[in-house]
Regions:
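Detector for small/aliphatic-rich hydrophobic stretches
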Residues: 9-11
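Conserved helicase motor core of SF1/SF2 NTP-dependent helicases
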Residues: 2-4, 13-25, 32-161, 165-243
């Protein structure tokens, strides 16, 4: 692990169709649980991450995704973002947004894109917006709705499934069934689930955390309120709110 982390601080290039995209990632884990998450991602193929808000789930996952994308010979050719508003049940929502299909999908992934930009900025990259735009233009970052996954086979990709608390068992099973090679990291906070279908006992994330822990190549990481790093006040709010 230490060799991989040291390598992440050096600037390397992602090359697609003759275009070199130069950037650096400098991830510094803030606690033992974040280090556990990084280790699990490198050691497993499919990783489930459960945790409350403010623990850095998305930041760590996306940092490793960018890091692995630029590392040579590790089988990762692109980052694919799958967000809950692109679920089968939300397909109709796409039609109500202006613009092309790609523009609509990227509107749903604004939080993920913002996270990627922040990572690049904190890592010392001068123009993170241009880097992200180049990665998107060269199809190194892509957003896919679940409805487009049926019959597909995803290989050599780092698949980030964020806000997975909104996915039902059926949604999550469909997503996992499309995985062929690379990494798939599925993360969420069940306490923030808003869909009634999920809240009424059909949470795909909770089902996976319970049923799939003993499979070789599958990793599970669970954060608690003690792992909150965003702001100390969030810990106090969480404790009071859930007491």
């Amino acid at each position: 692990m230490s060799k991989k982390k040291n390598a992440s601080s050096a600037s390397t290039k992602v090359v697609e169709t003759g275009v070199a995209i130069d950037y650096r990632v400098n991830l510094k884990c803030k606690n033992a649980k974040q280090k556990e998450l990084v280790k699990s991602i490198y050691e497993n193929d499919i990783i489930f991450v459960e945790g409350v808000f403010g623990v850095g789930k998305t930041f760590v996952i996306n940092s490793v995704a960018l890091e692995m994308l630029k590392e040579p010979n590790n089988g990762i050719d692109k980052i694919i973002l799958i967000v809950p508003t692109c679920s089968c049940s939300a397909t109709m929502e796409l039609g109500h947004l202006p613009g092309s299909l790609d523009e609509k999908l990227y509107n749903f992934a604004l939080n993920e894109m913002d996270s990627l930009r922040k990572i690049l900025k904190k890592s010392g990259n001068i123009e993170p917006d241009k880097i992200i735009d180049s990665l998107v233009k060269n199809e190194k970052i892509d957003v896919k709705p679940i409805s487009f996954l049926r019959g597909a086979s995803i290989e050599n990709a780092f698949i980030c499934v964020s806000e997975a608390e909104e996915f039902t068992k059926e949604d999550l099973f469909l997503i996992m069934s499309r995985f062929e090679s690379g990494k798939m990291v599925i993360s969420g906070d069940p306490l923030q689930a808003s869909r009634n279908q999920v809240r009424n006992g059909n949470s795909g994330l909770l089902h996976a955390m319970e049923k799939l822990t003993d499979i070789n190549g599958v990793g599970t990481v669970k954060f608690t309120e003690d792992d909150i790093v965003r702001n100390d006040i969030l810990y106090d709010i969480y404790k009071k709110w859930n007491s």
